[in-house]
Amino acid sequence: IGISGIEADGTLRDYDYREVKVAQTIIGHAREVWLAADTSKFNRPAMVEVGRLDQIDRLFTDAEPPAPFPALLEEAGVKLHIALDKKETTP
């Protein structure tokens, strides 16, 4: 799933209530929930609550999350995956 923001208490949020309903359905029925969120989403508020970090199994992001998120992820049992920036080079 994707979201608009993750608050410092671990609340996952979005702006579009229709997208929230879809994300909540996915969370409720999936065997494993993967969240994709770049680092701009941390400490970013949004209007509608999607869920909480403890409902997520894996988080994919572009850099190490700021404090307090590493501790929150560990406490929630979320596996963190940081994408590497591999620039293509031409021979």
Where on the chain are the PLM-derived regions?
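Conserved phosphate- and dinucleotide-binding cores of soluble alpha/beta proteins
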Residues: 1-91
